[in-house]
Amino acid sequence: MKKPFPFSAIVGQEQMKQAMVLTAIDPGIGGVLVFGDRGTGKSTAVRALAALLPLIKAVEGCPVNSARPEDCPEWAHVSSTTMIERPTPVVDLPLGVTEDRVVGALDIERALTRGEKAFEPGLLARANRGYLYIDEVNLLEDHIVDLLLDVAQSGENVVEREGLSIRHPARFVLVGSGNPEEGELRPQLLDRFGLSVEVRSPRDVETRVEVITRRDAYDADHDAFMEKWGAEDMQLRGRILGARAALPQLKTPNTVLHDCAALCIALGSDGLRGELTLLRAARAQAAFEGAEAVGRSHLRSVATMALSHRLRRDPLDEAGSVSRVERCVAEVLP
């Protein structure tokens, strides 16, 4: 079976790749929303990043990929204490999915054949410690998106139905993609995503030719292509793991907190999610760059992806949300 396309070999789309790397460093940033044209590497980037990350150690047979035997939920009835290594999970959420399929439900077959009340885990269980990818998230039913965002934020899935009361860990990075021409997300849901980026098809011939060349090389001689880009992927993996380890020791000056608040006030963003996400993303960026403390340069680097989707629409301002954030950053964080 072919390995996913190397993350380092993806041409362009730097902001999308940056957002995904930051969530790999600190999943607490929240999900990533990627809006833009079809065929711009959105799903490719998710699978490539997950493949780039180290294998996870999990209990054999555990439906929620528990890292320790004692963490396996009771309802799973896992007797094995054998630890195995498996790739970071990437779970696709289909558009017509039901709530039962997402969160889990009563195992009807066991109930009918054995008369036992057992829990059949859903997609959230499989996605634990990995990625949950939703293509065309703007076409998914609002209550499903709301449910996913709730679980992604809490890190726990709670199921109360048909006489069952089940809890299990569900810590994953939610990545949603979509085409804005096919419909938009409600502002309440937009605000729940940590980062948001816009992607566009390349407009210059050289970039498009490079995309075609790399994809053709990947399909023609998969092993040689993977070997060519393997060193860069391993280097990126090392930087991500180093940034994860450095996060707890990273210093955050009070001036940075002041800058976060001042920027969000200037933009008129509602609530405090903007400041919190901006700070988390800036800390991850600083750790990725090997800095000892968060600075204004890190805030400037992540401001558009952390704040552009949280702005109120201004009918008197024809500029897009990204342009408004960039303009405000230039004024508040010179």
UniProtKB/Swiss-Prot annotation:
Keyword Magnesium: no
CDD domains per the UniProt record, alphabetical: AAA
Protein name: Magnesium-chelatase 38 kDa subunit
Annotated SMART domains: AAA
UniProt KW keywords: ATP-binding, Bacteriochlorophyll biosynthesis, Chlorophyll biosynthesis, Ligase, Nucleotide-binding, Photosynthesis
Lineage per the UniProt record: Bacteria, Pseudomonadati, Pseudomonadota, Alphaproteobacteria, Rhodobacterales
Involved pathway(s): Porphyrin-containing compound metabolism; bacteriochlorophyll biosynthesis
Key word Plastid present: no
Function noted in UniProt: Involved in bacteriochlorophyll biosynthesis; introduces a magnesium ion into protoporphyrin IX to yield Mg-protoporphyrin IX.
Gene Ontology biological process terms in this record: bacteriochlorophyll biosynthetic process; photosynthesis
Name of the gene encoding the protein in the UniProt record: bchI
Name of the top EC class for this enzyme: ligase
Catalytic activity: protoporphyrin IX + Mg(2+) + ATP + H2O = Mg-protoporphyrin IX + ADP + phosphate + 3 H(+)
Species for this entry: Cereibacter sphaeroides (strain ATCC 17023 / DSM 158 / JCM 6121 / CCUG 31486 / LMG 2827 / NBRC 12203 / NCIMB 8253 / ATH 2.4.1.) (Rhodobacter sphaeroides)
PANTHER family: MAGNESIUM-CHELATASE SUBUNIT CHLI, MAGNESIUM-CHELATASE SUBUNIT CHLI-2, CHLOROPLASTIC
Molecular function, one GO term: ATP hydrolysis activity
EC number: 6.6.1.1
Family to which the UniProt record says this protein belongs: Belongs to the Mg-chelatase subunits D/I family.
